[in-house]
Amino acid sequence: LSSRFVVVNRQVLWRSPILLTPYRSDYTIDADELKEFFGNAFKEAELTPEDIDTGAVILTGEALKRNNARAIADLFAEESGKFVCASAGHNLEALMAANGSGAVALSRQEHQTILNIDIGGGTIKLGLCHGGKLLSTSAFAVGGRLIAFDEDGKMIRIEGPAEQVAEDVGVKLTLGEVLSKEDRKKIVSRMVDVIVSYATREPNDELCKALLLTENLPQTPAIDGITFSGGVSEYIYRREEEDRGDLGRSIAHDLRHALADKRIPEKVYDPGHGIRATVVGASQFTVQVSGNTIFLSEKEKLPIRNVPVASLSIDLSVDFTSEEVTASIQDAMKRLDMVEGEDRVAIAFRWGGDPLHARLFALAQGICNGLPKTVADPDLPMVVMMDGDAGRTLGNILVKELDVTGEVISVDNVQLRDFDFVDIGEYMPDTQVVPLIIKSLLFTSPGQE
């Protein structure tokens, strides 16, 4: 039996129009325009904020770099009281796009290796999927809005990576001037060359290397199919034709020609979610209750809200070492773009095998070594969650044998995964449990609504 609720039906009630992120000249996001957009959306959907049970605010790409980005996101999250707020770095955004686009589900359905190419305004995120799992991610600085134009065709925004590409093809970019058709074609063609190089896993020239934001994708396994997501994908799949005053439509046009010429030879699938890929997994509440063998070193500090979950991939049902636990934590943090010691995190794992002291001690030691800054920071709670019945024993080992002096929360009989955020409620002494609210980002499969 499981205490986790299962989603049996999902229905899209209303879709908003797409709003390009409103940037101001002082390197901030226009909060007033966002508020007006959200207000109009509620009116058109015939809903009020009180009607919404849960949601998510996700910061990605160029918007994440703006001076007031986090403050705006936190404001909307806190005003609703029910929203989670996540900052998506390159790896996490690639992971979310691969899931949200339907590429991960497609790889499971087709029993194939699928490469999702998420083309946004400032970056491209790659997600390599196989058998329903994301194997690897990568990102590089090419995007549809690295150059933006006004109604007269004059350049009103030029990002650094665009200047790198322009310099590579001998074009000078100047704000307020018109970019000639010939120079525009040179820049777009070179950007598509870079996309093709990364899609075929051959990014060997100097410009490709200069634009790389993460590690490269591995050379194996062989790719069977390609999917596209992000704003530019709407042009690739011909769902959008209107020019948005940037390079997006031109990039898609040249990329379609590259696909037709088999420069990217794999079959192209359309899983359907395109520009909404990173937000299609709208957050949902589930409720769980912990086991009664939990460990809380400082009960009075509860409740805590919106702790992101990092799920470990290590198999703890067989023999393992503390070093393997540490490596699994580091991999999870990297996968989700979390910075250990700066971000609160709940380490979640499946527990199997005998609850012998030696095994639990190795687990605890691996956790401490994987979270050294958390251990050293008395203001940062160590949150550990498992599906087995060893929460109290693990907590005792962490505090009494490994001398963790900060707050330790060790909760058992709970099932968590990546894209979950957890609220841990106040301790209930009569039943010796804590209530948990799990907010999950849920992703549809291709063909679902």
Protein language model regions, located:
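Short beta-strand scaffold segments in enzyme catalytic cores
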Residues: 1, 124-129
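Nucleotide/phosphate-binding catalytic cleft detector across ATP-hydrolyzing
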Residues: 4-11, 15-116, 129-250, 273, ...
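Conserved catalytic-loop position in the HRD/HxD motif
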Residues: 118-120
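Hydrophobic alpha/beta core scaffold segments
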Residues: 247-260
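Secondary-structure transition/capping motifs at alpha-helix termini
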Residues: 261-262, 374
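Short beta-alpha connecting loops at secondary-structure transitions
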Residues: 263-268, 312-314
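A short, well-ordered alpha-helical element
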Residues: 332-333
